[in-house]
Amino acid sequence: MAYHYSHDSDRRQPHGGYNYPSNYSNPSQYSIPDSVYSGHSTNTPRVPSPGGYHQQPSPTTRAVNPAYYQPQPTASSMTSHDLMYGRPSPGPNQYGAAPADVVRGPGATTVPLSQQAPYQPYPSHTDYSDEDKSFASTTHLVSPQKEWGVGSVVPVTTIPPVNQLPYQPYQAYPPRPSPSPITHRGGTSHWHAMRKQLLERRVIKQIPLHNGNLVMDVPVPKGVIPSTKGLGVMDGEMDSMRYSAATCDPDDFMGSKFSLRQYLYGRKTELFIVMTMYNENSELLLRTLNAVIKNIAHLTTRTRSKTWGPDSWKKVVVCIVADGRKVVDPRVLKVLQLMGVYAEGVMKDHVVDKETQAHIFEYTSQVVVSETGEVGFGSTPIQLLFCLKEQNKKKLNSHRWFFNAFGPLIKPNVCVLLDVGTKPSGHSIYELYKCFEKHPTVGGACGEIFADTGKWGKYLWNPLVAGQNFEYKMSNILDKPFESVFGLISVLPGAFSAYRYDAVANHADGTGPLAAYFRGELMNQPGATATIFDRNKFLAEDRILAFEIVVKKNARWRLQYVKAAKAGTDVPATVPEFISQRRRWLNGSIFAATYAMVCFWRIWTSGHGIFRKFTLTFLTIYNLFNLLFNWLSVSSFYLAFFFLISSSISGSSDPFNGAGDEIFQVFNKVYIALIFVVLVCSLGNRPQGSNYMYTFCIFMFAVCQGILLYCAGWTVYQTVPHTSEGWEDVSGLFENRTFVQLALSLMATYGLYLISSLLYFEPWHMLTSFVQYLLLLPSYVNILLIYAMCNLHDVSWGTKGDNGSSKDLGAAKKVEKDGKEMAEVALPTKQEDVEALWQQARQELRVPVKEKAEKRSPETKRADEDRNFRTNVVLLFLGSNMLIILLFTSSTFTNWVNSHFVDATSSTFNPYLTVIFYAVLGLSALRFAGCLLYLIFRMFGY
C-alpha cells in the first residue's frame, strides 16, 4: 500500500497511491513494491520520503496507528551517523576541534583549550567501514529525517549555539577570527581550499534513478537544524535537503515526472513568491529575503483569519531563481548554504547523457542571515525552493521555470513577483493577497514602489536620486490610481507585483497570457524571425502580461493598485546607470503601448461588461494622446523654451535688465548645440564611456530650465496688478490671455502635484525633491528619449546569453543493479569537510567585499538590420520634431501670428503654446479626477 499526504493535517493517509497529475501515464510506478521490504513484516506501514526513495522502516513492537506511522528512534546511544556508517574506532580527533581551529587563517592564533567554550565531542572520520561500498536500494532512508543514503554524512553539532531570533537577525554573536583577504573569485583562499578538499574526497555511490531522474535527499549540517522547530514541521523535513537535477525544458518539468516537496506533502499553497536574480550581490538578496521572511512571520500572527494562522508558513513557498550558475555571486551561494538550501559537491551537469538545465534545491529553513553575516534562527520556518539555472537565459526564462515548471505542481492561488534588491515592507505581501481575497475579479495587482532614500534621506543629496524619488511618488499618486479606476494598469512592475494564478494561466488550447508573455523569450533565440519591433516590445514584458490579462478571451479580469502595499528599491545613482535603465524602459514602453493600441479591439472579445469595455476604450484613446505627446516632446519642450523667453524679453520690461536679447541668443544656440551633442553621443557612445559628456549636458540643460522658469515667473508677474487698486478689478485679470494660459498651465502641473500630494497625505517629496525634478526635466526629454531612440537596435538587458553546456561538475552515469536503474555519482562523505566549509562560509559573510563596476556586453546578432531600422526611426523622430520647430519659428508664421493674434493684452504669446497648455490642462485634469475617484472608492472598500 502507498500513501499520500492529507491537505488538512499534513499526516499521511492510506489512499492506494499518490495523487499524481493526470498526464502521468503510470501512477503505479510511484508505489513502493513490497519486495523492497523483504525480511520485514509485511504489516509494517511504509512511509514514502519526499525524495521518492524506497525506505526500510525500523522494526518496532509498539502498537501504531495504521494510517500514520513515524519510525521511533532506537534505544541505542549511537548517532544517526553511526547507524548509517557504523561506529568508527577512536582517533586523534575523537573530541573534535573548535571551529577556529578548522578555519584558522594566516596570522590567527589558537585559543587555549582552557578558554574555549565546551563543544560536543564527535567521532573521528579517518576511517569508514563502508566507504567503498555501493548503496543498494534496500539500504536507503529509514524515514525522511534519516535519508542519509545519498552518501553524505550526518553532521553533528560542532558549533556554539546560535541566537533565537523573532525573524530578524541581531549582531549578538561573539566575534570570530578575521579570514584572509577576499579573492577575485568571491571567497578566501581558505574557503577554496576547503571546497577543493571536499570535492577531491568524494566517493562514488550508486543512487536509484527516480523515473530516470536524479533526485536525492542530502543531509544538512547540524548548524542548520534548529533545536526548537516551528509549528507544523514534519518529521525529517528540516534534516535533509532535496536535490533534483532537472534535465528538461521548464514546460516539460511535470511531464518528465519531476516533483516538488509541496506536491508530495499534499500542502495547499496560497502564496508562491519568486525572487529573480542575475549577478546581484548577497546584500541585495538578504535585503529582499529577510523582508519576505518578515512578511511570512506576520501571516502567522493573524490568528483570527480563515486562511492564515500559526502554521501559515506551510501555505507560502519562496522560490529563488538564479540566472546562470557561472555568473551568480559566490557570496549568494554561501548565504543559501548557511540556510541549508544549497550544498557544494552534489550538483551534476549531465545525468545519463542528458544536459542538466537547472539544479533545484528544496529545504524548509529557520535560519536567518543578516546583511552583516550574522546567523541566527527565526521563529517561522520558510519553505525555500532554489533553482540555479545552468545557463544564463535571462529573466523571462526564469519566470518560465516559476510559472510553467513549478506552478502546475504547486498550484498556488496568488503568485508574487519580486526582483532581488526590492524590499517589501512588513505587511505588504499580505495587503496584496487581501486584494485578491476581497475582489474575486482582480487578476493582477501592484503596490507602491518607492525610491530608497537612505537613513534620514541622505541619498537625496544626489540630485539624480531626488529627481527619481519625485517621479516615483507622483506616479504612485496620479498615474496608477487613475489607471486603477479603469481596471487596466499599463504596467505591473516585475520588481513588486502579484498575479492570480488562474488569471495568467493559458486556455486549454495553449493560448493565453503566459503564452503571449513567454513569446518574448523565443524572439532572441538563434534563427528567430522576430522583428525589431517585437523584440523592443518585450523589453517591457510586464506591460504585455498586464494587457493580456485584461483582454483575456471570455474573461473579466481587472488590475488594481494597492496603496497599502509598499516596497523600497534602489534607484540609479550614476548617470550611465540611469541612462541605460531608462533606455530599456522607454523603448519597451513605447513599443508595448503601440502594441496595445493596435490590439485594443481585443477588449471587445473579453468577458467584461459593456460599461467597462467603453471605459477601457476611452483609456486607450487617452493613452494614444499621451503617446503622441511623448513622441513630440522634444519639439514641444524647445518651443516652450523659445517662446516663453522671447515673449518675456520683447516687452517694455526686460527681466535681464537690457541683456535679455543677448542672453536669449546665447542660450538658444547652446540648447540646440546640446541636442546635437546628445545625438552624436547616443549614436556612437555608451553612457559608461561618455559619463562626463552626459553629465555636462545634464548640467547645461538644468541651467536652461532655470532660465525658462525665471522667464515664466517674470511673465506672470508682469501681467498681474502691482497696486492695491489694480486688484479691485480681478475680472480684468482673467481677460489677459497670457496670464490665464500661463497660470492654468502652471496650476495643471505644479499646482496639481501639490494638491494631490496633500490629498494623499504625502507632501514631503514636494519639499525635498521638487526642485531637483524640475531641473532634471529637460534631461528626461532631450537626453533619455533621444538616447533611447538612437539605440533601438540594442534589445539587450545588459546581459549576455549563455547557450553552451558545461562539464565541470561531473556526470551521473547510468548503471543497472539487480534489474534496477542506478546512477553512479561522486558525493561528499567526510563530515569534517561539510562542517568546515559551512563554518568558513559563515565566517566570510562577515567580511564585506568591495563592489566592482559592472561591464555590459552589447548584443551583436542581427546588427546590420537592427541599426538600419534604428536609423530610419531616428530620422523620422528627429525630422518630425524639427519640422514642428521650423514651422512655428519661421518668420512667415511669426508675421501671421502678429497680424491675427497679438493685441494689447496678450503680448506676443504664441497660439501653438495655447494648444499645448490647454492639452496639458485637460490631461492633468483627467489624472486628478482619477486619483480623486481612487480615494473615494478606497474609502468605501472598492
Swiss-Prot record:
Residues 18-33 have a biased composition (Low complexity). Belongs to the chitin synthase family. Class III subfamily. This is Chitin synthase 2. SUPFAM superfamilies: Nucleotide-diphospho-sugar transferases (SSF53448). Its EC number is 2.4.1.16. Residues 71-80 have a biased composition (Polar residues). It is found in: Cell membrane. It is a multi-pass membrane protein. It is an enzyme of class 2 (transferase). One of its GO terms (molecular function) is chitin synthase activity. Pfam families: Chitin_synth_1, Chitin_synth_1N. Coiled coil: none annotated. Polymerizes chitin, a structural polymer of the cell wall and septum, by transferring the sugar moiety of UDP-GlcNAc to the non-reducing end of the growing chitin polymer. Disruption phenotype: Abnormal capsular morphology: abnormal fiber distribution, decreases capsular diameter. Decreases extracellular vesicle secretion. It comes from Cryptococcus neoformans var. grubii serotype A (strain H99 / ATCC 208821 / CBS 10515 / FGSC 9487).
